[in-house]
Amino acid sequence: MISANSLLISTLCAFAIATPLSKRDSCTLTGSSLSSLSTVKKCSSIVIKDLTVPAGQTLDLTGLSSGTTVTFEGTTTFQYKEWSGPLISISGSKISVVGASGHTIDGQGAKWWDGLGDSGKVKPKFVKLALTGTSKVTGLNIKNAPHQVFSINKCSDLTISDITIDIRDGDSAGGHNTDGFDVGSSSNVLIQGCTVYNQDDCIAVNSGSTIKFMNNYCYNGHGISVGSVGGRSDNTVNGFWAENNHVINSDNGLRIKTVEGATGTVTNVNFISNKISGIKSYGIVIEGDYLNSKTTGTATGGVPISNLVMKDITGSVNSTAKRVKILVKNATNWQWSGVSITGGSSYSGCSGIPSGSGASC
């Protein structure tokens, strides 16, 4: 005979088994295998703890349920393989990605570095983001990326804050093309309060709209860049703000580069209240002659730069550097004021500066 209590317990157990994971469920991924990842991804709170990702595999956190939180704890590492990556991929809406106190996401880049970047052995990109719906990525500690760090593509309404990217080891060990943030085909993205030590652009905005880069520190790389723009499927930058940033000991300070012979648009770009120091090549460089990672000396106007504001830019360049270089065509409606860069020398070959803009070399 089955008692009423037994029947109740059986019913509750069956309900628990049949009910999908609730918002309160937390799952932890640890160890050296991704075999349980498909199950972990169904949880609304995901902890990545002391994980070693197998060679040639992606920590695939794509397609997460809306509102999921991902927390990195301990040390995350990646076994070696020559491949394009990414090592981590995250997508979804209203996603929160956070770093716990004392954690590190270590790309162990020295295994791949050869001083050649894209021209050498195949190196994996580090973190690919496709996040929307007021998602947030905050407090991550990234160390020694093999290649580009954050690939921000097809994102919207995303805030990235308080990230530390430390690739200082690459300065002497062959790190190259270690961009901090690469932005493409994205809108309403805010990157703030981050610190980047690397060997390439601190940020490169290749396409997108309403991209804001504020209150960040950029060390040792190639500075803050719009572009290169041109030669891709999306060749429009409409709305970029770089405000209250510090660029230190970098090749360039502030840069816009468009591809020679290409078509596209760069408009509504604002560099405001940025400080530069220890710049090795150019304090400000705006060039329409970029091609195959070099400049040709001949600007073309297929990607015109319009509605450019350069305001309250201060600092210094090294003795062998140029303070400002401008080589463009078809540029319109520039407004420059409060640009005060000391050291170095002037660039004698500037051309294409819109009249009445206040810009000069």
UniProtKB/Swiss-Prot annotation:
| Domain of life (superkingdom) | Eukaryota
Q: Which UniProt keywords apply?
A: Cell wall biogenesis/degradation, Disulfide bond, Glycoprotein, Glycosidase, Hydrolase, Repeat, Signal
Pfam name, any one = Glyco_hydro_28
Disulfide connectivity?
Answer: C27-C43, C202-C218, C350-C361
* Catalytic activity field: (1,4-alpha-D-galacturonosyl)n+m + H2O = (1,4-alpha-D-galacturonosyl)n + (1,4-alpha-D-galacturonosyl)m
An annotated GO BP: pectin catabolic process
Gene3D superfamilies assigned: Single-stranded right-handed beta-helix, Pectin lyase-like
Q: Indicate the secretion signal residues.
A: 1-18
- Under the GO molecular function aspect, what terms does this record hold? polygalacturonase activity
Q: Which GO terms describe its cellular component?
A: extracellular region
Residues with attached carbohydrate: N318, N330
Please verify whether the record's keywords include GTP-binding: no
Q: In which family does this protein belong, per the annotation? A: Belongs to the glycosyl hydrolase 28 family.
Listed name of the protein: Polygalacturonase
